[in-house]
Amino acid sequence: MKVAVLGAAGGIGQALALLLKTQLPSGSELSLYDIAPVTPGVAVDLSHIPTAVKIKGFSGEDATPALEGADVVLISAGVARKPGMDRSDLFNVNAGIVKNLVQQVAKNCPKACIGIITNPVNTTVAIAAEVLKKAGVYDKNKLFGVTTLDIIRSNTFVAELKGKQPGEVEVPVIGGHSGVTILPLLSQVPGVSFTEQEVADLTKRIQNAGTEVVEAKAGGGSATLSMGQAAARFGLSLVRALQGEQGVVECAYVEGDGQYARFFSQPLLLGKNGVEERKSIGTLSAFEQNALEGMLDTLKKDIALGKEFVNK
């Protein structure tokens, strides 16, 4: 199994690469790519860690050598948020980066599963889909927006509030991956109940958690380490499912049946070909139903922006 990380010299990319080097199954290959000249050195650094995962790093304009034969491609390349910026302020720079890299994926490993980490995910996934379509290689079961950070944050905050072990809590999060489009389904967490105020406060904290980190880092960066962990969790789940493990479920932002929006984050059963089944979002509370209806305009606009970017 070969996994490629594009944007591997950045804060998320390095954290992700470290976790994959230590946790991918023995015999896996890991290839790192970034425009930055330091990238081969990041691979050499990681190569000294004693795990049976072969690693190589590539830099420059051409990602081809990193992509050849890749089964999974995780894209974290782009600029990070600064204080006062919304994820959508990143759009102008990151849209071009994602378009370029996905064109290279389409050419070199068209059958790979692609996980988009680069923000704004609501829009960059739509860009990737249009690029893959134009190249004639789009498979909606193999393109994912990685929203796992919303899930791990939800798990952490709920566990803290309710005195649970974080590993025992799993909160489904649906919708998109910024602001009001992030909707944790707190009513579906087994064995835990919340007051209306707790639901309102937790939902807001989960939606604004990225800003919490940006402000705490005081201009020195955004959520890179927790995002690296989230991306690793998603990437490793995908690898396990591709290798035939049964019952692997993760939430991610994918093209579905369009019931809510063309792209929508929901629980997915993963399998040998990517998405095996888009699972139902279940019964929502009145608060969640309201929040869902209230986000759809924003989500649809974000998606339209991506489509327009590629077709302009």
From Swiss-Prot:
It catalyses: (S)-malate + NAD(+) = oxaloacetate + NADH + H(+). The keyword Transmembrane does not apply. InterPro entries: L-lactate/malate_DH, Lactate/malate_DH_C, Lactate/malate_DH_N, Lactate_DH/Glyco_Ohase_4_C, Malate_DH_AS, Malate_DH_type1, Malate_DH_type1_bac, NAD(P)-bd_dom_sf. NAD(+) binds at G7, A8, A9, G10, G11, I12, G13, D34, N94, I117, T118, N119, M227. GO terms for molecular function: L-malate dehydrogenase (NAD+) activity. Catalyzes the reversible oxidation of malate to oxaloacetate. This is Malate dehydrogenase. Homodimer. It comes from the Bacteria. Keywords: NAD, Oxidoreductase, Tricarboxylic acid cycle. Its EC number is 1.1.1.37. NCBIfam families: MDH_euk_gproteo (TIGR01772). The active site is at H177. One of its GO terms (cellular component) is cytoplasm. Belongs to the LDH/MDH superfamily. MDH type 1 family. Substrate binds at R81, R87, N119, R153. GO terms for biological process: malate metabolic process; tricarboxylic acid cycle.
